[in-house]
């Protein structure tokens, strides 16, 4: 008897707790739903979301539709669906009225249909309470004051048939959510081929943004096929950019320490090293700042129609301008070798054109950069996060990247071959006339050095050009396979990752080649003297006068002048060749 009474009290207490439970209101934190006329909501919502973070991810997929402005109360309707109104004195969440849903559907469905989308099943209107039934059912609903209270029968019948067609294709696993996940079957019929923006791309409001021939479409911030490779890409970028920065800095500082040692035709190597140093800095900024901060605009990649942020522009300027400048200086280097070997120009004669070399070396890439900015061709890379040219637009890549690099490469290699052939003929001539002289050995050594340097530079440059040609041929096919229902599906995950890794490596490894040129015992001596002079430059003069003993009869002879020069003592840090 006592046990029965205890069970009875336990059941009564449980029922009381159940009926006395009220929903808990919480402040709205979803950015899209702030400042829309109410600020309190309750969870879980009708979609089963337990937290606002979950609901926010789904409702923000409709943001492009809100930006289009097809319906003035669309934001209110979406927010009341995903973050229903919560009132402390009302036990149920307040959903939007069916009339509001129908009005939103009637005004926004035509725009969605224009791009091959249907009104999503998750926003079905038939399950929502009607404004006219609030008094009879007691189910309160939300709607702006100007919402039509009656529907046209023909319009209602049309929407009902449309939803029945949607239910025919409805998956039992649950409705797909968001514009990017709506069933993309062409409304005109399955037999008609039509290209529309769908995953893995993002629908955007701007008609200037397009992927292939599909407008209002953009690449996602991150390539969805490489979700597990972001750390690999970042670590790969860090390794090559940091090592390139170190080696290019070493080369350029060596040139500054002993400028007179490096004359034309080899001096352009150090301009090339400086350019590669700046390219490496651009990659390092991307690595330390992050992918999203550099190349992304919310959930999508920055496109050509966007106003690129300051960091994105800085990364573009460092990687594109100085990358193209390095290619121009490569052509100038090959030209100076031709002038030296084929035309027998002296270093002084070549140096007289130094100003012209600098004008071409810096103005030509500057003109290219200005044209890129004028045509708004800067965009982000969804794989590496680098702001460059042609990451999402093949036409811009072809005009501003592939064509200039191909021209610079062909001209540079042509000059290089001409100079190399002339050096070879000079070497053979010297060997025939003076086989015992050391000059032939020095020419052979110089040819070997030039040959190794040329291979170290031309191979990465050729790889970049080949990769760009591959992208020109295959990226458009992949885009078409994702956008068009009648195209055979293609995967690009592994190949796009390999392409990005090759481009990053080749753009940075060019800085290694300049380090090869200065690797010698003379360079070590120059650094040793420079380091020693840093500590002694303030305390010791560069020259120390010597006591010269001479006879009066020697003052008028030429031997006196030569003898006095030999008794002057030069300290470290002053080059032997003045």
Curated annotation (Swiss-Prot):
Residues 138-175 are annotated as: Disordered. Residues 160-169 have a biased composition (Low complexity). Residues 150-159 have a biased composition (Basic residues). Disruption phenotype: Displaced anterior nerve ring and neuronal cell migration defects including irregular localization of canal-associated neurons (CAN), hermaphrodite-specific neurons (HSN), anterior lateral microtubule neurons (ALM), and the right (but not the left) Q neuroblast (QR) and its descendants. Axon growth and guidance defects whereby some HSN, male CP neurons and CAN extend ectopic axons or branches, and furthermore some HSN irregularly route towards the ventral midline of the body. GO terms for cellular component: plasma membrane. Expressed in two pairs of head neurons and throughout the pharynx. GO terms for molecular function: G protein-coupled receptor activity; Wnt receptor activity; Wnt-protein binding. This is Frizzled-2. It comes from Caenorhabditis elegans.
């Amino acid at each position: 008897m006592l046990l029965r009474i205890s069970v009875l009290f336990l059941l009564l207490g449980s029922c009381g707790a159940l009926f006395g439970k009220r929903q808990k209101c919480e402040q709205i934190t979803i950015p899209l739903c702030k400042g829309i006329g109410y600020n309190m909501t309750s969870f879980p919502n009708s979609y089963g979301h337990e937290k606002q973070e979950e609901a926010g991810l789904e409702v923000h997929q409709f943001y492009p539709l809100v930006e289009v402005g097809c319906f003035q109360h669309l934001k209110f309707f979406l927010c009341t669906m995903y973050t229903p109104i919560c009132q402390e004195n009302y036990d149920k969440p307040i959903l939007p009225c069916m009339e509001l849903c129908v009005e939103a559907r009637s005004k926004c469905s035509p725009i969605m249909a224009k791009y091959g989308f249907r009104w999503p099943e998750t926003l079905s209107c038939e399950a929502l309470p009607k404004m006219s039934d609030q008094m009879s059912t007691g189910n309160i609903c939300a709607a702006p004051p100007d919402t039509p209270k009656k529907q046209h029968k023909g319009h209602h019948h049309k929407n009902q048939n449309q939803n029945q067609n949607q239910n025919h294709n409805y998956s039992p696993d649950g409705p797909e959510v968001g514009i990017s996940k709506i069933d993309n079957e062409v409304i005109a019929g399955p037999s008609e081929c039509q290209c529309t923006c769908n995953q893995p791309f993002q629908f955007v409001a701007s008609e200037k943004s397009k992927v292939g021939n599909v407008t209002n479409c953009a690449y996602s911030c991150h390539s969805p096929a490489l979700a597990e490779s972001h750390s690999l890409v970042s670590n790969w970028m860090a390794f090559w950019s940091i090592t390139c920065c170190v080696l290019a800095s070493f080369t350029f500082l060596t040139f500054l320490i002993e400028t007179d040692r490096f004359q034309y035709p080899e001096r352009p190597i150090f301009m090339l090293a400086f350019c590669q140093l700046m390219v490496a800095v651009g990659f390092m900024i991307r690595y330390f700042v992050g992918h999203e901060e550099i190349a992304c605009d919310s959930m999508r990649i920055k496109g050509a129609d966007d106003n690129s942020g300051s960091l994105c522009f800085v990364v573009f300027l460092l990687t594109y301008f100085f990358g193209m400048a390095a290619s121009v200086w490569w052509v100038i280097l090959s030209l100076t070798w031709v002038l030296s070997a084929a035309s027998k120009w002296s270093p002084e004669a070549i140096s007289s054109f130094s100003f012209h070399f600098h004008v071409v070396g810096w103005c030509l890439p500057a003109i290219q950069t200005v044209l890129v900015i004028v045509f708004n061709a800067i965009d982000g890379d969804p794989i590496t996060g680098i702001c460059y040219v042609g990451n999402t637009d093949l036409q811009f890549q072809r005009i501003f990247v592939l064509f200039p690099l191909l021209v610079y490469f062909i001209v540079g290699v042509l000059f290089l071959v001409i100079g190399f052939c002339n050096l070879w003929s000079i070497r053979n001539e010297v060997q025939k006339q003076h086989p015992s002289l050391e000059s032939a050995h020095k020419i052979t050594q110089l040819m070997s050095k030039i040959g190794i340097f040329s291979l170290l530079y031309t191979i990465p440059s050729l790889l970049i050009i080949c990769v760009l040609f591959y992208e020109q041929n295959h990226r458009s096919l992949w885009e078409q396979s994702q956008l068009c229902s009648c195209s055979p599906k293609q995967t690009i995950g592994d190949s796009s990752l390999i392409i990005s890794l090759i481009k990053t490596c080749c753009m940075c490894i060019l800085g290694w080649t300049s380090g090869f040129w200065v690797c010698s015992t003379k360079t070590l001596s120059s650094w040793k003297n420079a380091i020693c002079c840093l500590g002694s430059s303030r305390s010791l003069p560069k020259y120390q006068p010597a006591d010269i003993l001479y006879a009066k009869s020697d003052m008028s002879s030429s031997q006196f002048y030569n003898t006095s020069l030999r008794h002057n003592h030069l300290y470290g840090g002053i080059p032997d060749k003045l």
